[in-house]
């Protein structure tokens, strides 16, 4: 689409090259006509770049702001004091007014203005060499004028012609310090324009006034509310004040109001009388007043350190619509390969939409500005998906302004901004953690000076992690370039820190001497993990274990294999040995394995070769007879369970979660089974014991039990056997004979109304809830 837009613009520029003169005799001078297809080409031009007609106002305000920027720079070295013919000085602002009777919208700025030659150059010909330069810069991804402030000229380029989206006729009056005369450029967008001295004389002193005769279907732009809404959307943070003239009803007074100053020279809050105003019977009159619209100044352009925390909070609420203060903010400026200003905020609540996996939905939390002009908030990857909860603004002078979103999306500059923005965002999170640690160590600064970021008054990282930890863990899977930065931000509870989170670095710092790696267990909750038999082994060895309680952790550890040079080890995997064996122990282990080899072969045959990959002697210090672990290079039982819950198509995924049976030879039941199976491989008691222990171990490890009914029957048989009851003993006979019921009692019972027992239970439950 971007190439298509470029092709159209190139075609327009080529067709508009060269102009011809035709005669006219209406007093406006000689009209200048472009080639015959100009109207069609202009239509292609504006519609190829703009789909929303309201952007014409953004373009004109941006042009006016550039013109004011230019004159401000020029006056730093060569100040002047121009005046209108009535002796009024032009103002350094933009003003928008209306003539509803004529359906005219009027925009005026006190900027640099244009001479007759500049009007012809910038408005009269799209086919100049400037257009070629514009197209070249467009292709390079650099906007005309770039980041050089001396090029901040109020030249009307491609964007100006968006005015014909809403206007039937446009008149541009302009006065430059370089000319004694004020000129008017006028066109209906029909292939020709007029250029003539303004018959009104010097009404501007300096600057430009654009009068748009609105199309019948664009008269909504005669509404002050519509104009203000559009300004808030696109031009809220323009460097200069923007005033809109409004009609307000005020109580009439006996005193005669002073004559209003000429339009464009009024101060904020000044009153301009409607010459045709009439008081009603209740003493109310209509007056015209200038209303300042863009009261929220672009605080990101102010020096970092000169903005208070309260101002940042106020700004956040204004631009985000969130009524809460942000959890954290960071204001920074990037210079070098690309220059931009940015303020990023971390909200105090999670937007459920941030967990959406629909990549076609743009992230609208980051608003992109170019020279303080809002461009778009619909980039899908200005920040990666895992950081889509961060809100903020980015303002760059190095991006092109008047191009489509598709062209910007491919911009090299935008890719650089994205890379730096991600680094700054992760640095912001690290700062929250660092301040947390400082507070914990008693190093909190009581009354810090403004520094462009939040100064925490109390710990906040725990809340941040609980809100956005899932997002950061997703980042480990999606952003390999920043994986190390992300893992430093991770926080977990552990067997030594069940109530407070610790970082992986903290875990590493307090590892036992000689410890092989970072041990962890995953589960639905800390309470469930604490009941795991494999945790018992770590506790017995005084080894700390990380508790991972979020489903996403299982996916994360598949990507995150180590941290700070220490391997991450899942205690639920086979063959975990927390202490090294000496030579004597290794020899004994080999002999022990030979002793139990036939026993293990029998167990594997009993439970099924397809279900149990292998049977081994456990090296864990545990009181359990059997442990079921996952294969070393296989997915865990928990991950398989999570995958089954996420998609029915993965219902058979459990087959890849291979089971390893670990046998504790020191357990009395294991010793009894070994003896019984050595005598008789079909021993029923030993078989029942083996199955019950195996199924129980499966449940503890979150593997499913294949035959729950058989499991229940085996437990029943073992319980009968433990109290010397035969498995064949049937139920006892009914004991009705023990209870004597008289005929009278039976008759009385028959006469009682029948009551639904379930209804009684439900009624009791409701009553308990009420209590």
From Swiss-Prot:
Belongs to the heat shock protein 90 family. Residues 1-24 form the signal peptide. This is Endoplasmin homolog. It is found in: Endoplasmic reticulum. Disulfide bonds: none annotated. Residues 253-282, 727-771 are annotated as: Disordered. Molecular chaperone that functions in the processing and transport of secreted proteins. Required for the synthesis of lipophosphoglycan (LPG), a cell surface glycoconjugate. Necessary for the attachment of the galactosyl residue to the mannose within the phosphoglycan repeats of the nascent LPG chain. Also required for addition of phosphoglycan to acid phosphatase. Not required for normal growth. Has ATPase activity. Binds heparin with micromolar affinity which may facilitate infection of host cells. The keyword ATP-binding applies. GO terms for molecular function: ATP binding; ATP hydrolysis activity; ATP-dependent protein folding chaperone; heparin binding; unfolded protein binding. Keywords: ATP-binding, Chaperone, Endoplasmic reticulum, Glycoprotein, Heparin-binding, Nucleotide-binding, Signal. The gene is LPG3. Glycans are attached at residues 63, 306, 402. It comes from the Eukaryota. Its main location: endoplasmic reticulum. Prominent antigen during human and canine visceral leishmaniasis.
């Amino acid at each position: 689409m971007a190439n298509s837009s470029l092709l159209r613009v190139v075609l327009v520029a080529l067709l508009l090259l060269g102009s011809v003169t035709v005669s006219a005799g209406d007093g406006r001078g000689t009209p200048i006509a472009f080639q015959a297809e100009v109207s069609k080409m202009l239509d292609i031009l504006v519609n190829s770049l703009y789909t929303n007609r309201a952007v014409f106002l953004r373009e004109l305000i941006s042009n006016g702001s550039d013109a004011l920027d230019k004159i401000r720079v020029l006056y730093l070295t060569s100040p002047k004091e121009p005046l209108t013919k009535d002796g009024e000085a032009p103002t350094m602002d933009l003003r928008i007014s209306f003539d509803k009777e004529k359906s005219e919208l009027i925009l005026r700025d006190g900027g640099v203005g244009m001479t007759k030659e500049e009007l012809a150059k910038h408005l009269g010909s799209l086919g100049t060499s400037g257009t070629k330069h514009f197209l070249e810069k467009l292709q390079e991804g650099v906007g005309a004028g770039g980041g050089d402030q001396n090029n901040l000229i109020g030249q009307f380029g491609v964007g100006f012609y968006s005015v014909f989206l809403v206007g039937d006729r446009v008149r541009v009056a302009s006065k430059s310090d370089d000319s004694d005369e004020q000129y008017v450029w006028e066109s209906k967008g029909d292939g020709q324009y007029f250029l003539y001295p303004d018959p009104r004389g010097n009404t501007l002193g300096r600057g430009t006034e654009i009068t748009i005769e609105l199309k019948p279907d664009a008269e909504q732009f005669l509404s002050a509310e519509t104009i203000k809404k559009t300004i808030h959307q696109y031009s809220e943070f323009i460097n200069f004040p923007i005033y809109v003239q409004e009609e307000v009803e005020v109580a009439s007074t006996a005193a005669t109001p002073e004559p209003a100053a000429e339009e464009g020279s009024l101060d904020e809050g000044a009153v301009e009388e409607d010459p045709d105003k009439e008081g009603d019977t209740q003493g109310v009159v209509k007056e015209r007043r200038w209303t300042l619209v863009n009261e929220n100044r672009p605080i990101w352009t102010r020096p970092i350190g000169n903005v208070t925390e309260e101002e940042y909070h106020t700004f956040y609420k204004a631009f985000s619509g969130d009524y809460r203060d942000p959890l954290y903010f960071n204001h920074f400026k990037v210079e070098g390969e690309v220059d931009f200003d940015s303020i990023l905020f971390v909200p105090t609540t999670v937007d459920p939409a941030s967990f959406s996996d629909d990549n076609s939905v743009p992230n609208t939390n980051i608003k992109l500005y170019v020279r303080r002009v809002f461009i778009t908030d619909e980039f899908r990857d200005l920040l990666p998906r895992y950081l889509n909860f961060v809100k903020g603004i980015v303002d760059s002078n190095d991006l092109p302004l008047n191009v489509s979103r598709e062209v910007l999306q491919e911009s090299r500059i935008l890719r650089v901004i994205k890379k730096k923005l991600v680094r700054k965002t992760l640095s912001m999170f690290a700062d929250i953690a660092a301040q947390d640690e400082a507070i914990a160590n008693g190093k909190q600064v009581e009354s810090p000076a403004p520094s462009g970021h939040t100064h925490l008054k109390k710990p906040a990282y725990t809340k941040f992690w609980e809100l956005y930890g899932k997002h950061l863990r997703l980042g480990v899977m999606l952003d390999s370039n920043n994986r190390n930065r992300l893992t430093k931000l991770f926080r977990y509870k552990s067997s030594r820190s069940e109530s407070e989170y610790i970082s992986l670095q903290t875990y590493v710092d307090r590892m036992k001497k000689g410890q092989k790696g970072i041990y962890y267990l995953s589960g639905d909750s800390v309470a469930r993990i604490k009941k795991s038999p494999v945790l018992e082994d770590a506790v017995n060895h005084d080894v700390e274990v990380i508790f991972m309680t979020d489903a996403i952790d299982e996916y994360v550890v598949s990507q995150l294999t180590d941290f700070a040079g220490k391997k991450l080890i899942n205690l639920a995997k086979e063959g975990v040995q927390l202490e090294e064996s000496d030579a004597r122990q290794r020899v004994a282990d080999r002999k022990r394995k030979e002793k139990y080899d036939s026993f293990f072969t029998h167990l594997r045959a009993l439970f099924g070769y397809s279900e149990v990959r292998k049977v081994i002697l456990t090296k864990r210090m545990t009181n359990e007879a059997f442990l079921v672990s996952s294969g070393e290079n296989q997915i865990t039982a928990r991950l398989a369970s999570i995958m089954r819950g996420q998609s029915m198509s993965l219902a058979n995924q459990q087959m890849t979660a291979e089971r390893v049976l670990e046998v504790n030879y020191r357990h009395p039941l294991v010793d009894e089974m070994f003896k019984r199976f050595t005598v008789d491989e079909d021993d029923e008691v030993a078989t029942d014991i083996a199955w019950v222990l195996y199924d129980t171990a499966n449940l503890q490890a979150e593997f499913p039990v294949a035959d729950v009914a058989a499991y229940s029957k085996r437990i029943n048989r073992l319980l009968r056997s433990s109290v010397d009851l035969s498995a064949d003993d049937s139920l006892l006979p009914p004991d009705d004979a023990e209870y004597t019921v008289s005929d009278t009692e039976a008759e009385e019972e028959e006469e009682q109304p029948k009551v639904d027992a379930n209804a009684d239970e439900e009624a009791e439950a409701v009553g308990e809830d009420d209590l």
